[in-house]
Amino acid sequence: MGLYQVISDLMSVEISKAYEPTKVEEKWFSKWISAKAFHADPSSEKQDYGIVIPPPNVTGVLTLGHVLNNSIQDILARRARSKGKEVLWLPGTDHAGIATQSKVERHLRETEGKGRRDLGREAFLERAWEWKEKHGGIIIKQLQKLGCSCDWDRERFTMDEEYSTEVQKCFVHFFNSGKIYRGKRMVNWCPSSLTALSDEEVIMKPQKSKLFYMRYEIVGREGEYLEIATTRPETLMGDSAVAVNPKDERYADLIGQKAFRPFPKAEIPIIADEHIDPEFGTGVLKVTPAHDKADFEIGLNNDLEIIDVLNPDGTLNELAGEEFSGMDRFEARDHVAAKLDDMGLLVRVEDYENNVGFSERADVPIEPRISMQWFLKYPKIEESIASVSDQDIHFRPERWAKTYSHWMQNIQDWCISRQLWWGHRIPVWYRKDRAEELQKAESLDKETAGDALHVGIDPPEDEENWIQDDDVLDTWFSSWLWPFATMDETTKNKFYPTADLVTGPDIIFFWVARMIMAGYEFTGEKPFSNVFFTSIIRDKKGRKMSKSLGNSPDPLDLIAQYGADALRFSIMRIAPSGTDVRFIENKNKDEAEVNDYPQVEEGRNFANKLWNAARFRQMQGSTDGVKELPDLEELSIYDIDILRKLDSLNEELSDSYSSYKFQEIANKLYDFFWSEFCDWYLESIKLSF
């Protein structure tokens, strides 16, 4: 019986006839926790293995993406333990500034009919912390239900007191070194969340828009017009010029002339700019410096007036004119077009497909907006580029290294301030007698502020004479410190740099690149050696799974129906490295019935097969203790054959682990155990029992 005896002898408790995954999984997870099986000991002399969890949003819930990501991390952590390493898998959650504040504000509106400004900052933050305490542990409990072998005693939160201190130290460090400054720039603005966003927080979506062709009369040439094409007629009240390409012969004689802006009626210059595309529309551009990034640059180069006609919430303000003031931007688009039509200045409207930037969190079109914000000049750019190109840090799949390199070589200063209340408040204080002057300054840094600005972890001693900056830091400004700010010095000395990072390619710029730069800046070392980018999970139609589409099942329902092991194993079997995952759901005609998930059902069947095989062995006699294999001559041909296949499997799996080919590992294990071990070996030796 050889191999089978060795495997089954590990079991001494009677195995029940029916496999009930919920009971089994809850029992063993409880035993693991009681035995501190996942505890990481920094004083251990064993070889270290460290991995930090990408912290999910504190008020989030488990998704299939979390299942995939954390199953891979669990495989890596358990594999390292099996190899005799001291393992730290560090868990935690992110405070998720915009996402959490939006949920709290929605709750306040629904339950009390109030907004955050009705409560005031201090009272609102009390409610936010109450919300976090009530809902913040849900996803941690769900990850435990999934069976994740983290060191749960080390759970961290990005707004823990100690972690917050590290974030403040980071800001002070960069301000004192001249890398943080405050400036008036055009930023991405979310009219829903009322905050600035970084470029990485904006996602481009294809939209079916309209292209409006309108006429601006040329000053001094009555009856002659310039025809202009635009997707945004609602901002024409902020036009301060009309621009053409200097090489466009159609308009060469008009450069230096003026045209009439339709309303409020005003003469605006016709200028030349080489960035104008003669092929777009009519080759004539309305220049609105306050509401377009390209126009803003044109405005700076030509000293144009900046006329902001939008309020922060996306409604039009008084500069747009009384008839449009207070009107939503999209409603105003139609009204402005109608007025142009009434004036005989609307030529035609065409269907037009273009890409529009949306706030990733609020899912609304963003607005380019000129605003005073805090910015960071990124540190350690060259070292961070070299670490990946020289493969000191390995990206898997390797193609993501090119994406990373391209972004790093074209990197822009990071807008780190957010107009929120939930988050790490910027540790900057303005002297009261100069606060208004400093906050309106076009540029502000360590050199220009002098002693009128206090930047520090603690407020100034005479705090009553100072006003703290209202803004908070971008959530990613705290999470880019995650690999080392989560560890005390003893733990860091043992487990940092970490071995692996498992994450999605969608946050390669938000998080991965920034962690690499922060690692070199604050520790002088890389934060991790390997980055494994997971696949995107899609439905059988190829659509990305999301709550809004209603095509994403609740993993907890799947766990209840099939078991956590079944779900984890099935996800790994369908998740090839470097390509998207197709997750199949078969809808039942009877809505009262539970839907069918054939891939997860295969996972459950496999777990059931393991259970029955173990039970079959237990029924044959004693399973106490692990016994050594007998001599070769005492083994049957069936034993020898299965041992040979097992040796071959071990070699193949070792190669697959080294290459992070988790789908390959799952399928090899499935094929070996189901076909070779159960269907062939067990059936062959049954007569010998």
Residue ranges of model-derived segments:
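Flexible, glycine/threonine-enriched loop-and-boundary segments that flank and lead into catalytic domains
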Residues: 197-225, 414, 443-473, 481, ...
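Structured ligand/cofactor/substrate-binding pocket environments in proteins
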Residues: 65-77, 93-94, 163-166, 225-341, ...
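Active-site-adjacent bridging/hinge elements
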Residues: 45-53, 75, 111-115, 140-147, ...
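N-terminal, positively charged nucleic-acid-binding surface of large information/translation enzymes
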Residues: 2-247, 271, 288-301, 305-320, ...
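Gly/Pro-rich turn-and-neighbor structural signature
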Residues: 162-193, 201-203, 215-219, 407-477, ...
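Long, charged, mostly alpha-helical binding arms that flank functional sites
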Residues: 16-17, 98, 106, 348-362, ...
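Short glycine/proline-rich turn/loop motifs
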Residues: 52-58, 120, 387-398, 492-498, ...
